[in-house]
Design a protein with these regions (language model features):
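AlphaC helix of the eukaryotic protein kinase fold
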Residues: 47-67
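Activation segment signature within eukaryotic-like protein kinase domains
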Residues: 121-122
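Protein kinase catalytic-loop region centered on the HRD/HxD motif
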Residues: 126-139
C-alpha cells in the first residue's frame, strides 16, 4: 500500500486514504507544483489472482475513460504501471455517493429528498448515458447503481467506476463475460439473452 506522505512518480504527494474496495485502495494526493488534488486508485499485484487478466481490464477501463470528455465523468490524468502496483490518477470528486445519500435519508427518519433534486439527478444521468451511447463506438456502462454515482456539493453528479464498461460491438451475439450487480443487472448480463446494449443501462 502507498504510505501517507510518500511521493508517487516524483509529483503526487499522498495525503490520506479516502476509500477501499475489493481489489483497490483510493488515496487523496496533491500535486504540489500545480497545487491541485487528485485521487489515486491503487491496485496491488500481490494477493490478486490472475493479475494479468485484471491488468487487462484496468487498461481497458483507463482507455475508455481517456477517450471521453463530459462534465459528469471523471478525467484520467496519469497511469503508472510498475512491477508491484497499477496506479490510476484521476479527478478527485468531492461529495457523497447517491447510495450514501439514500441511506442517510432512511437513517434520519426519512430526512426528505426533494422531488426537484431527484428530477435533476435523473436528467443528468440521461445526459451522460446519451453521451456514452452515441459515441462513434458506443460505450455500455453495465453497472448503473446509486453507489456508482457521486453527488457533488454543487448538486451535479459524476458517474464513477468504469470497471465493467465495454465498447458495443455490432454483430456480437453475447458478451464475453457476465458482469453486473445483482438487483440492478439486466437479464442479458447473466448470459444467453444477447449482448449488453444501451437498453441495458436504462434497465439498470
Amino acid at each position: 500500500m502507498l504510505s501517507i506522505g510518500s511521493v508517487v512518480d516524483g509529483k503526487y504527494k499522498v495525503l490520506n486514504k479516502i476509500g477501499q474496495g475489493g481489489m483497490s485502495v483510493v488515496y487523496l494526493a496533491l500535486n504540489e507544483r500545480a497545487n491541485k488534488t487528485w485521487a489515486i486508485k491503487e491496485i496491488r499485484k500481490d494477493g490478486v489472482q490472475d493479475f494479468a487478466t485484471v491488468r487487462q481490464g484496468l487498461i481497458a477501463e483507463t482507455n475508455i475513460l481517456k477517450s471521453l470528455n463530459h462534465k459528469y465523468l471523471p478525467s484520467i490524468v496519469d497511469v503508472i504501471d510498475d512491477k508491484d502496483t497499477f496506479l490510476i490518477v484521476m479527478d478527485y470528486i468531492q461529495g457523497k455517493s447517491l447510495n450514501t445519500v439514500l441511506k442517510e435519508s432512511l437513517e434520519h427518519e426519512g430526512l426528505p429528498i426533494f422531488v426537484e433534486d431527484v428530477i435533476s439527478w435523473g436528467k443528468q444521468l440521461c445526459d451522460v448515458l446519451y453521451y456514452l451511447h452515441t459515441r462513434p463506438q458506443p460505450i455500455i456502462y453495465r453497472d448503473m447503481k446509486p453507489a456508482n454515482v457521486m453527488l457533488k456539493p454543487d448538486g451535479e453528479i459524476c458517474v464513477v467506476d468504469f470497471g465493467t464498461a465495454r465498447v458495443f460491438k455490432t454483430g456480437n451475439t453475447e458478451d464475453t463475460t457476465c458482469l453486473g450487480t445483482p438487483g440492478y443487472a439486466a437479464p442479458e448480463q447473466y448470459g444467453g439473452n444477447g449482448q449488453t446494449r444501451p437498453q441495458t443501462d436504462i434497465y439498470n
